Amino acid sequence: MLEGAKSIGAGAATIASAGAAVGIGNVFSSLIHSVARNPSLAKQLFGYAILGFALTEAIALFALMMAFLILFVF
């Protein structure tokens, strides 16, 4: 019973990975639209996009960490 609950909890924690994938897609789609509107700001916008990517990917890594904690610690 406890093993099943752990698996369900870990699966629920990894749902955040789908949200992170959508967020990363939004970051880079916004970058493409912004560079298409104003190509002279491409270098500055790329820096912002990489920052947005890193922050969004951190959410997925935290979710993965929580899934491992649920599976192997609790």
UniProtKB/Swiss-Prot annotation:
SUPFAM superfamilies: F1F0 ATP synthase subunit C. The chain crosses the membrane at residues 8-28, 45-72. Its main location: mitochondrion. Coiled coil: none annotated. The keyword Transport applies. InterPro entries: ATP_synth_F0_csu (IPR000454), ATP_synth_F0_csu_DDCD_BS (IPR020537), ATP_synth_F0_csu_sf (IPR038662), ATPase_proteolipid_c-like_dom (IPR002379), F/V-ATP_Csub_sf (IPR035921). This is ATP synthase subunit 9, mitochondrial. It comes from Glycine max. The lineage of its organism: Eukaryota, Viridiplantae, Streptophyta, Embryophyta, Tracheophyta. The gene is ATP9.
